Swiss-Prot record:
Belongs to the IspD/TarI cytidylyltransferase family. IspD subfamily. Its EC number is 2.7.7.60. It is an enzyme of class 2 (transferase). This is 2-C-methyl-D-erythritol 4-phosphate cytidylyltransferase. It comes from Solibacter usitatus (strain Ellin6076).
Length: 244
């Protein structure tokens, strides 16, 4: 069963910090260079390495489509990787990419463009789970104690301590049947619902979403310290590749 992959990459990267942005020449994390290549391209390569991925669609800001398309086609000239204009939010960007997919596509995986260390085995495990159940995400156990709070005008107060054994920290890929994800977006638009991930939108349809164990290495590069860790991970990957 072939999988279509959507990489939303239209974000502005406001959390990376001014110093890191000035050093990198851009505040947008997906375009920052990691060992000579944009983070986005490292992520694309991971999915392109899977024979189960039929197409990869990257959603970027409208003004970036031409130059990103040029960068992509230099490495992937066959049309398997495409670039489309995203929207003003992650949700709009994913929806724009979703509307461009072939109607006979069966499974759709949505993955953060700035998670370039997804493991191929985990990727295939979540593909398999979604093929069986219709909806699956990658997640890791919560290691910190999580508090539910109420925010007042002057104080933030603890309302409850959530049972850690019942919590997972959601990662990506998040993989769904094509028709199910389309319906989730249609319902969200109709209701004015804005989700922080695709799973939250599918959950609104009373659909059970399975969780496949993820990895602590599958980091989302968000802060300057994440870039330091990413350089380390990439050098480790290069060393393993040389040894093999």
């Amino acid at each position: 069963m072939k999988v279509a992959v959507i990489l939303p990459a239209a974000g502005l990267g406001t959390r990376m910090g001014k110093g890191t942005a000035e050093k990198a020449g851009t505040s947008r994390k997906q375009f920052m260079l990691l060992e000579g290549s944009p983070i986005l391209m490292h992520t694309v390569r991971k999915f392109a390495a899977s024979p189960r991925v039929g197409e990869i669609v990257i959603a970027v800001r409208a003004e970036d489509t031409e130059w990103v398309r040029e960068v992509v086609t230099q490495e992937f000239p066959g049309g398997r990787v495409r670039v489309v204009a995203g929207g003003n939010s992650r949700q709009e960007s994913v929806e724009n990419a979703l509307s461009s997919l072939s109607p006979d596509c069966e499974l759709v995986a949505v993955h953060d463009a700035v998670r370039p260390f997804i493991d191929l085995d985990i990727m295939h495990a979540v593909f398999d789970e979604a093929a069986e159940t219709g909806a699956a995400i990658v997640g890791v156990p919560a290691v910190d104690t999580v508090k539910q709070v109420t925010r007042g005008t002057t104080h933030v107060r603890v309302r409850a301590t959530l049972p850690r054994e019942k919590l997972v920290m959601a990662q990506t890929p998040q993989v769904f049947r094509h028709d199910l994800l389309l319906r989730a977006f249609q319902e969200a638009r109709k209701d004015g619902f804005i989700g922080t991930d695709e799973s939250s939108m599918v959950e609104r349809l009373d659909v059970e979403v399975s969780v496949v164990p993820g990895s602590d290495r599958n980091i989302k590069i968000t802060k300057p310290t994440d870039m330091e860790l990413a350089h380390l991970f990439l050098r480790e990957e290069a060393a393993r590749s040389t040894l093999s």
